[in-house]
């Protein structure tokens, strides 16, 4: 049977962990009473039969109220909070001696009261937040329905021409200017700062958070604005529509709108007062409302879970207390818990039913099953067959890799000054590229395993849906199956060369292997994790076209991964040139190295990941206005300069370039180490409870964090190989390069865990368990 502690910790909302009943602390307080009681029993071994009979008779209901009053050893008082808010505070008074250690009993009930007050206040705060969100979404639905009715009425009256049938729209009058991104960001930050106080001030912060009015930031002085929001008058209401600039088409349309608006002002006051609201815009607005309703429904379910688990926690700890002390406290205190606000309030249940009804009626076409796919998505069940195939493919990969290594050793392919240079220049880059790629993917699977074990909500951080979320077993299956295929193909390729086949006859095999993986990646059939593959393609697209796309956590996390895969990208570029130019047919592997534009492209590939990441920082600064993004941009600029000096030094090995490599690489390394430890991992806090770490740690062993910092430092210094020209004896320099590239991939895999741990703790500190989806419409006064 699973212990309640594990069951409780396994089912609670990770980001709200500090707001749940501190069950472990209550168990510690109860253990003090238990240890003291056991010590007294050893000194006084005699037992009283009369007391035992009386206590047993007192429990029987036949003795009525008299028996109940005798068992009433505590009284729970309900008071108003001293801060003057409407929050109730519970305080327990001991009417008689409960345990041999009275102080320990008082300490236990003080902690129990504190937990009950905390749960009540947090529930009220979140309930108020969700109710306000629900009221806002109800207005959004009304506006959306009204605009949809306007379209239907227009079509019914036959007003639309042949042109408008292609893109039906209604004309609305613009009544004011556009909104400010930074102003909205400041408002959000001020609201978040109130939540930050909760971690520092405990109950008082919860009280102030519950009683505080919404804070509005003054955005009049903000210079950075966006045309994503426009105000129009439709059906007797002034409504502001805000469509986020999340992709290039919206960004360019917003810029063209600004140009048209400025030209219309020159032509006259009435030149630009009409705004066409198309079906496309309404469709996007409907998507935004659908996403907001889904997140609200998820938050309401979290609040239900919060209530149920806390009730169980109170019940279990009171049962344990009764068992230790022999008293009947459970029925008395549990009655207070059941009558407290967080248990008797039904507002969350009512709102949850309303959200479900709205979704079914207006967004799912009265189809309940379709609505439930959005509101309650089913997660894929983990199959034992996946585990079986992981083991099968692992065995195949090990056997094929062993065979490949033996054949390579016998032929001397990887030795320095080998006669088989052609193989190392053409086939080996394919193997090393796939090796680095799937090593990275394997480490990502290890990351997922550790995140789940540490209760880090990575799917929420990455905004992964149930369809495109890969479990760690899925990742391991992809890795083992792919590497088995790669090792098998490369083993066959090398064996054919050993049997006397010419390079011309077998050289197409590595190219076909690469082509096969590319076809699987873009395959439109619903096989091989289609949703995850297409999500990966969309993320790569967002990175490549930075800063035109709005940057989310998954985008810049993936861009950071590419910064550690520069050798893989250079191999990919060389392989593409080798096969696209037809060099494999002429066996002229040096062609791609002789051509100037290829050499220039090789330099560009070394810069690209850092450039993409820098552009993402610029876009985040543009959207949010935080200077920390500009400082982060400087880190990637320093990395680009360091990479550029390394490439130049490889081309022209002079003392001047060597000094420049050392200087630039040292600056970039120090910059990156500081950002890794302080910003990305949140460590090196000198006033922390854990020396030079941070106050909250997801791993119990502090030594792991110190070891990880040292290991990250050592692996960051891999660039020294460029200066020292170190290599393994009798081993080709390309193998040495692969080994060093693999070390950087391992460093990135280690970095990933602590980066998401810090992000999760930031979410937990702000009790952020659901996304805040922007809403498309906002009513404004005519004066505005």
UniProtKB/Swiss-Prot annotation:
Alphabetical UniProt keywords: Cell membrane, Membrane, Phosphate transport, Transmembrane, Transmembrane helix, Transport
Keyword Plastid: no
Cytoplasmic side: 1-387, 451-474, 529-654, 725-784
Domain of life: Eukaryota
Subcellular location: Cell membrane
Segments traversing the membrane: 388-408, 430-450, 475-495, 508-528, 655-675, 704-724
GO CC aspect terms: plasma membrane
Membrane topology label: Multi-pass membrane protein
Residues exposed to the Extracellular side: 409-429, 496-507, 676-703
Disruption phenotype: No visible phenotype.
Domain SPX: start-end pairs: 2-335
Tissue: Expressed in vascular cylinder of roots, leaves, stems, petals, sepals and filaments. Expressed in receptacle, stigma apex and anther connective tissue.
Induction remarks: By Pi deficiency in roots and shoots. Induced by sucrose, auxin and cytokinin. Down-regulated by abscisic acid (ABA).
Main localization (coarse): membrane
Annotated ranges, domain EXS: 593-784
Any one GO biological process: cellular response to phosphate starvation
PANTHER family linked to this entry: PHOSPHATE TRANSPORTER PHO1 (PTHR48477:SF1)
Function, in words: Contributes to the loading of inorganic phosphate (Pi) into the root xylem vessels.
Family as reported in the entry's similarity comment: Belongs to the SYG1 (TC 2.A.94) family.
Entry protein name: Phosphate transporter PHO1 homolog 1
Source organism per UniProt: Arabidopsis thaliana
Encoding gene (name): PHO1-H1
């Amino acid at each position: 049977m699973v212990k309640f502690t594990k069951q409780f910790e396994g089912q609670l909302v990770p980001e709200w962990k500090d707001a749940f009943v501190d069950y472990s602390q209550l168990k510690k307080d109860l253990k003090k009473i238990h240890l003291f009681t056991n010590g007294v029993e050893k000194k006084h071994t005699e037992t009283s039969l009369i007391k035992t009979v009386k206590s047993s008779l007192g429990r029987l209901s036949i003795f009525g109220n008299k028996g109940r009053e005798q068992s009433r050893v505590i009284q729970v008082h309900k008071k108003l909070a001293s801060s003057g808010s409407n929050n109730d505070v519970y305080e327990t008074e001991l009417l008689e001696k409960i345990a041999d250690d009275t102080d320990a009993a008082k300490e236990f009930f003080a902690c129990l009261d504190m937990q009950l007050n905390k749960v009540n206040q947090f529930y009220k705060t979140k309930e108020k937040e969700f109710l306000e969100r629900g009221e806002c979404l109800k207005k959004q639905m009304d506006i959306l329905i009204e605009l949809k009715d306007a379209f239907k009425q227009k079509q019914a009256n036959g007003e639309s021409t042949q042109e408008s049938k292609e893109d039906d729209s209604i004309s609305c009058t613009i009544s004011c200017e556009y909104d400010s991104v930074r102003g909205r960001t400041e408002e959000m930050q001020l609201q978040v700062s109130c939540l930050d106080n909760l971690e520092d001030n405990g109950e008082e912060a919860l009280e102030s958070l519950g009683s505080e009015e919404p804070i509005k930031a003054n955005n009049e002085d903000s210079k950075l604005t966006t045309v994503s929001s426009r105000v129009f008058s439709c059906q007797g209401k002034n409504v502001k529509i805000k469509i986020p600039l999340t992709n290039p088409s919206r960004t360019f349309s917003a810029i063209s709108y600004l140009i048209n608006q400025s030209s219309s002002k020159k032509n006259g006051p009435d030149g630009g007062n009409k705004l066409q609201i198309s079906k496309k815009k309404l469709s996007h607005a409907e998507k935004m409302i659908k996403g907001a309703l889904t997140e609200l429904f998820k938050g309401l379910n979290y609040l239900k879970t919060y209530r149920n688990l806390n009730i169980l926690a109170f019940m279990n700890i009171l049962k344990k207390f009764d068992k230790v002390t022999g008293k009947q406290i459970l029925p008395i205190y549990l009655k207070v818990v059941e009558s407290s606000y967080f248990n008797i309030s039904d507002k969350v249940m009512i709102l949850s039913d309303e959200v479900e009804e709205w979704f079914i009626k207006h967004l799912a076409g009265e189809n309940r099953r379709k609505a439930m796919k959005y509101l309650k998505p089913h997660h894929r069940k983990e199959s034992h067959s996946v585990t079986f195939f992981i083991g099968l493919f692992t065995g195949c990969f090990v056997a094929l890799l062993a065979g490949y290594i033996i054949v390579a050793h016998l032929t001397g392919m990887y030795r320095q000054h080998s006669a088989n240079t052609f193989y190392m220049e053409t086939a080996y880059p394919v193997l090393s590229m796939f090796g680095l790629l799937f090593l990275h993917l394997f480490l990502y699977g290890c990351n997922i395993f550790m995140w789940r074990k540490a209760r880090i909500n990575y799917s929420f951080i990455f905004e992964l849906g149930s369809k495109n979320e890969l479990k760690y077993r899925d990742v391991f299956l992809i890795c083992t199956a792919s590497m088995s295929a790669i090792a098998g193909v490369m083993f066959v390729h090398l064996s054919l060369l050993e049997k006397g086949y010419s390079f011309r006859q077998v050289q197409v095999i590595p190219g076909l292997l690469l082509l096969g993986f590319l076809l699987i990646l873009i395959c439109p059939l619903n096989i091989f994790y289609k949703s995850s593959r297409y999500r990966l393609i969309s993320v790569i697209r967002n990175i490549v076209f930075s800063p035109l796309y709005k940057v989310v956590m998954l985008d810049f996390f993936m861009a950071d991964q590419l910064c550690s895969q520069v050798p893989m990208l250079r191999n990919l570029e060389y392989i593409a040139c080798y096969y696209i130019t037809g060099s494999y047919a002429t066996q002229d592997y040096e062609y791609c190295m002789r051509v100037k534009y290829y050499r220039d492209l090789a330099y560009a590939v070394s810069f690209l990941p850092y450039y993409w990441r820098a552009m993402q920082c610029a876009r985040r600064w543009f959207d949010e206005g935080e200077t920390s993004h500009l400082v982060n941009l400087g880190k990637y600029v320093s990395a680009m300069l360091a990479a550029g000096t390394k490439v130049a030094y490889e081309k022209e090995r002079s003392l001047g370039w060597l000094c420049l490599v050392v200087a630039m690489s040292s600056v970039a390394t120090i910059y990156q180490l500081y950002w890794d430890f302080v910003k990305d991992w949140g460590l090196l806090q000198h006033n922390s409870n854990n020396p030079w770490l941070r106050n909250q740690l997801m791993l119990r062993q502090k030594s792991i964090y110190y070891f990880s910092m040292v290991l990250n430092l050592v692996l960051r210094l891999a660039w020294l190989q460029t200066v020292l020209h170190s290599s393994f004896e009798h081993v080709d320099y390309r193998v040495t390069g692969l080994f060093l590239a693999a070390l950087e991939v391992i460093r990135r895999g280690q970095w990933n865990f602590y980066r998401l741990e810090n992000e999760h703790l930031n979410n937990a500190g702000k009790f952020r368990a659901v996304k805040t989806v922007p809403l498309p419409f906002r009513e404004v006064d005519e004066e505005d």
